[in-house]
Amino acid sequence: LSSGYLLLEDISDDRCYEAWYAKTSPRLEALGIEVSHAISDRAKALIKLAVTGFECDSGADLFHAQQDLSRWLGPKLARQAATAEKQAIVAQTTEEKAPETATEAEQHDLKEQSLKARKDYDQAKQVQATYHENLQGISDAIHPFSLIDNSPNDAEKVEEGLENRAKAFEHLAGEQDISDKKDVMKKFRNQIKPLAVSVSFWWMWVSETLQGLAVDKDLEDWLTTTLLPVVYWHRQLHLTQNSRSREHYRKAWTQASHILNAHPFSATLPDSDIQRWLTWAEWMVRQFHRSSSAVEGRNGCLAQLYHNGRGLTPQRLRAL
C-alpha cells in the first residue's frame, strides 16, 4: 500500500493462482479493500489473480522489465569493454617498450595498433553508454508527466517511448552481434501495454477524484497541469537513489515550480485553499505505482536475509 503497510506475508512453495487467491481474498475482504489495479512481475498466476480474481487491470513491474534487458545485454557489453580495455593497455605498453633497434616501419605499426586498440575501447565504452541511456530511458518514459516539458503523459505516449527504446536495444544488439536466444525483446514488447497502463489508470483516478470534488474547469486545469507536476517530481526526487534519475527529476521539478509560481491562477487562491490542494496532490501522487514494492517478495526476502547474515530454513528454500 502507499502507506508501506503489507496486506499479507506468508511463506509458501505453492504459487499457483488458486493459492494466491485463497490467501489474498479473505484478507482484502476483511479490510474492505477492492483492488482496481495490480502490478506484478508478469507471473501467469499473478496476471490471472488480477484479471480473474480481482477483475482489474494487470500492470507490469518496471524493475523486472529492466532486469530482463540488463541480464541479456549488460554482462556481454561489460565483457566486451573489459576485453577492449586490456587490449588497449597491452598495445600501448608494447608501443612504449619497443626496442631501440625497431625500424621506423615497425614503430609505425606498433603506433597504429595502439591507436586502433584505443579506438576500439572508446567505441566499446560508447556502446555501454548508449545501453545505459536507453535502459534509463525506460524508467524516464513511465511517468504521468513528461520529463521534458511536464506535459501530461498518456498510455499512447508511454507506449511510443518504450517502443523506441526497444528498437534501440535491437539495433545495439545487432551491431554487437549479440543474439536474443531467450526472446527478451519479444517479452519486453509484450509488457509495453501493461507498463503503460499504470499511467492511464492513475490519470483516470485523478479525473474521477476531481469529478467527485466538483471542481470547475479552470481549477482542474491548474491542478492537473501546474500543481500536480511540482508535487509529483518533488516526491520522485526524494524517493530515488539513482543519481541520474535524481538529476532528471530535479530539473523537471525546478521547471514545474517556476511555472507554478508564474501562473496567474496561483495568485487568486487563498493560502488555505492552496494548502488544501497541496494535501490532495500529495495524497494523489502517492497513489502512482509502476513497480511492486522493493521490500516484498522473493527478491526482498533474499536481500534482507543476505544483509542480516541469516540462514535459509528448509521451508524458505522450498518457497524461494
Report residues per predicted region.
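Short amphipathic alpha-helical "interface-anchor" segments enriched in bulky aromatics
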Residues: 287-317
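Amphipathic, non-membrane alpha-helical segments in soluble helical-bundle scaffolds
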Residues: 128, 152-155, 159, 192, ...
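Short, glycine/acidic-enriched loop or turn micro-motifs at the edges of active sites
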Residues: 44, 67, 299
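Short, hydrophobic/aromatic alpha-helical segments in well-folded domains
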Residues: 23-27, 184, 301
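Helix-centered, glycine/charged polyanion-binding patches within enzymatic domains
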Residues: 53-92, 237, 244-295
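RNase H-like nuclease fold core
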Residues: 1-38, 43-56, 60-62, 72-79, ...
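Conserved aromatic-histidine-acidic binding/catalytic patches
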Residues: 8-13, 34-38, 283-290, 308-312
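Long, low-complexity, polar/charged, intrinsically disordered or flexibly structured peripheral segments
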Residues: 137-281
